[in-house]
């Protein structure tokens, strides 16, 4: 037995951006493409040892990320450029590292997070798009974004989101705290921006699906509040499609001092 000391272990956080349209979600699964699998493979090549990552939020199939955060541990000592440029050179073109930061032992990408923020982008036009067709959700009926915004404000604060929770959701509780929800129009694009401490499964897409019914004047503004109070998923609208959804930011305590690049996607301001 050697008395050599164990090499030091480094804990590293990364900001990750990805186009989820060609993946079966974030989480590694057997025999299907996942973002986690591609990232771990690229990191393992740079570290020259097996790497396992932990993420802030496991996005579903077809959902994108501009502000995903992960952490991993490694004995490999590398310069920041290796974890950014080097890893990116080993990643497919639809996944990229945006930043790197050494973090203390008590940091965890999921459990240290205090809030997550999503943006849902609707291309509101009579005709379907060709460019960015997998990065927006097409809705052909005219939408009243101001009406959608007003209807959504009842979701602020701590509420039971059973009516906007997927049937297969495994969370112990349907209660979540929504910090803001804003609906704005940018030309033909309608953007739903929502931030909460955490989300139940399909929560954003289920909220957006019902807000589109209000925006299209198929339901009154009061309908969202009625759905929230009913605590019945079967009364709400269908789940909005995955392709318009982006995880754009994750909040952490200031002491971790993580970078905060522009959220996007694309030209959308913070």
UniProtKB/Swiss-Prot annotation:
- List the signal peptide residues: none
| Keyword Zinc attributed | no
| Keywords, comma-separated and alphabetical | Isomerase, tRNA processing
* GO molecular-function term, one example from the UniProt record: tRNA pseudouridine(38-40) synthase activity
Could you tell me what reaction this enzyme catalyses?
uridine(38/39/40) in tRNA = pseudouridine(38/39/40) in tRNA
Q: List the disulfide bonds.
A: none
Q: Name one GO biological process term.
A: tRNA pseudouridine synthesis
Q: Which residues bind substrate?
A: 118
E.C. designation(s): 5.4.99.12
**In this UniProt entry, which residues are annotated as the site Interaction with tRNA?**
58, 78, 110, 126, 139
**Family annotation (Pfam families):** PseudoU_synth_1
Q: Which InterPro entries match?
A: PsdUridine_synth_cat_dom_sf, PsdUridine_synth_TruA, PsdUridine_synth_TruA_a/b_dom, PsdUridine_synth_TruA_C, TruA/RsuA/RluB/E/F_N
Stretches for region RNA binding: 107-111
Question: Which residue intervals make up region (Interaction with tRNA)?
Answer: 168-172
**Catalytic residues as annotated in Swiss-Prot or TrEMBL:** 60 (nucleophile)
Subunit structure and binding partners = Homodimer.
Q: What does this protein do?
A: Formation of pseudouridine at positions 38, 39 and 40 in the anticodon stem and loop of transfer RNAs.
Sequence similarity: Belongs to the tRNA pseudouridine synthase TruA family.
Q: What is this protein called?
A: tRNA pseudouridine synthase A
* Source organism: Escherichia fergusonii (strain ATCC 35469 / DSM 13698 / CCUG 18766 / IAM 14443 / JCM 21226 / LMG 7866 / NBRC 102419 / NCTC 12128 / CDC 0568-73)
């Amino acid at each position: 037995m050697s008395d050599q000391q164990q090499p030091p272990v480094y804990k590293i956080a990364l900001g990750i951006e990805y186009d989820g349209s060609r993946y079966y979600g974030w989480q590694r699964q057997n025999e299907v493409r996942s973002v986690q699998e591609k990232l771990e493979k690229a990191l393992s090549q740079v570290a020259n040892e097996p790497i396992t990552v932990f993420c802030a939020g496991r996005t579903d199939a077809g959902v994108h990320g501009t502000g995903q955060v992960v952490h991993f541990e490694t004995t490999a000592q590398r310069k920041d450029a290796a974890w950014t440029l080097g890893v990116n050179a080993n990643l497919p073109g639809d996944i990229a590292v945006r930043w790197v930061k050494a973090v203390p032992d008590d940091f965890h990408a999921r459990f240290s997070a205090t809030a997550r923020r999503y943006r849902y982008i609707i291309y509101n036009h009579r005709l379907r798009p060709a460019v960015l067709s997998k990065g927006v959700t097409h809705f052909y009926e005219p939408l009243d974004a101001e009406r959608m915004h007003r209807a959504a404000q009842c979701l602020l604060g701590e509420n039971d989101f059973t009516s906007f929770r997927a049937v297969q959701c495994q969370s112990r509780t349907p209660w979540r705290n929504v910090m803001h929800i804003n609906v704005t129009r940018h030309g033909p694009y309608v953007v739903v921006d929502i931030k909460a401490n955490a989300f139940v499964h399909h929560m954003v897409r289920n909220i957006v699906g019902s807000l589109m019914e209000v925006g299209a004047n198929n339901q009154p503004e009061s309908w969202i509040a009625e759905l929230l109070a009913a605590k019945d998923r079967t009364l709400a609208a269908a789940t909005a499609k995955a392709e318009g959804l982006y995880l754009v930011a994750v909040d952490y305590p200031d002491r971790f001092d993580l970078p905060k690049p522009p959220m996007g996607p694309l030209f959308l301001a913070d």
